[in-house]
Design a protein with these regions (language model features):
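Internal intein/HINT superfamily modules and their associated LAGLIDADG
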Residues: 1-254
C-alpha cells in the first residue's frame, strides 16, 4: 500500500498535464492505481473493498462503465469465476504471452472495476492469468454459473445491455482481444500479363457459444459493421469499410 505522500506526488505529476503512462514509468506506480487515486486518494480504513455498486440499496451501474464493457467482453471470451473461501471469488482472464499490451489493458480494467483489491498476473504455459479476488464478481458478472459457457444460456441483464449500448466498441474490443484476431489474406491477379499479389485484412471472431456469437454480431450491427458467419463457430468481417471501422476502434492485438 502506498502512503499519502507517494499518492499525492503521483497525482501532482499527473496534474501537470503529463500522461498516466509517463507518470507510471517515472514512479513505478501502475496507471490503474493513479487513476483510482483521482477518484479517492485516501486508503479505505479496515475493509479493503468499497461497496459493490450492484449490492447497494438501489443497485447502480459500475463506476467505470467503459472499462466494464471491455472486461465483460474479455470475461465472455476467456474468463472464468471460481469460488474460494469465505464467500470470496476469483476472476481469471487468460491472456496470451504474445500480446503484452493486452495483458496490461486487462489488468487496468480489473483494477478500475475493483480498485481496492489486488490484481495479480499468474504465469502459465504460453499465457498469463490476470486474477483478482472479490466477493462481488458474481454480482458484476451474473453470467457466472456451473459448467462451460457454450453449454448453458448466456444473456445480458438489462443493466449490462445498457452499458454495452453506451460503450459498444469497448465490448467489441474485449471480445476480439479474447477470442478474435486480425489477419491478412492475399490473392493474385493477372494484370497486363503480369501476376500481381493483393493483400487485404480481415477480422475473425471464434466462440463455441451461439449466445456469445449473437451478442458479438448484435453489437457489430449496432455500430454499422458488416459481417458473415461461415460456420457455427466463426464470424468474419472482410468488407473494406467494416475492417476500417474495426481498425479505428479495435486494431490488431499488441
Amino acid at each position: 500500500m502506498y502512503d499519502m505522500g507517494t499518492r499525492r506526488r503521483a497525482l501532482a505529476l499527473a496534474d501537470q498535464g503529463r500522461s498516466l503512462n509517463s507518470v507510471s514509468k517515472e514512479t513505478g506506480i501502475s496507471r490503474a492505481a493513479i487513476r483510482s487515486w483521482r477518484i479517492r486518494v485516501e486508503p479505505l480504513d479496515g475493509n479493503r473493498s468499497r461497496p459493490c455498486p450492484r449490492c447497494r440499496a438501489t443497485p447502480e451501474d459500475p463506476d467505470e462503465p467503459a472499462a466494464y464493457a471491455y472486461l465483460l467482453g474479455l470475461y465472455l471470451g476467456d474468463g472464468c469465476i471460481s469460488p474460494l473461501r469465505r464467500g470470496v471469488y476469483s476472476l481469471r482472464i487468460a491472456c496470451a504471452d504474445a500480446w503484452p499490451g493486452l495483458i496490461d489493458a486487462c489488468v487496468e480494467a480489473v483494477q478500475l472495476l475493483r480498485p481496492d483489491n489486488r490484481v495479480c498476473r499468474v504465469r502459465s504455459a504460453g499465457c498469463q492469468y490476470v486474477t483478482g479476488s472479490s466477493k462481488h464478481w458474481p454480482c458484476l458478472f451474473p453470467q457466472h454459473g456451473p459448467g462451460k459457457k457454450h453449454e448453458r444460456e448466456i444473456a445480458l441483464e438489462p443493466w449490462q445491455q445498457r452499458i454495452v449500448d453506451a460503450h459498444p466498441w469497448e465490448f467489441v474490443r474485449g471480445l476480439i482481444h479474447s477470442d478474435g484476431c486480425r489477419v491478412t489474406n492475399w490473392t493474385t491477379r493477372l494484370v497486363a500479363g503480369k501476376t500481381k499479389r493483393y493483400e487485404y485484412p480481415r477480422y475473425f471472431f471464434t466462440n463455441r457459444s451461439a449466445d456469445i456469437l449473437r451478442l458479438f454480431t448484435g453489437t457489430l450491427d449496432a455500430v454499422g459493421v458488416e459481417w458473415k458467419q461461415p460456420n457455427s463457430r466463426n464470424i468474419s468481417v472482410a468488407k473494406k469499410a467494416s475492417v476500417a471501422l474495426l481498425d479505428t476502434h479495435v486494431g490488431p492485438k499488441y
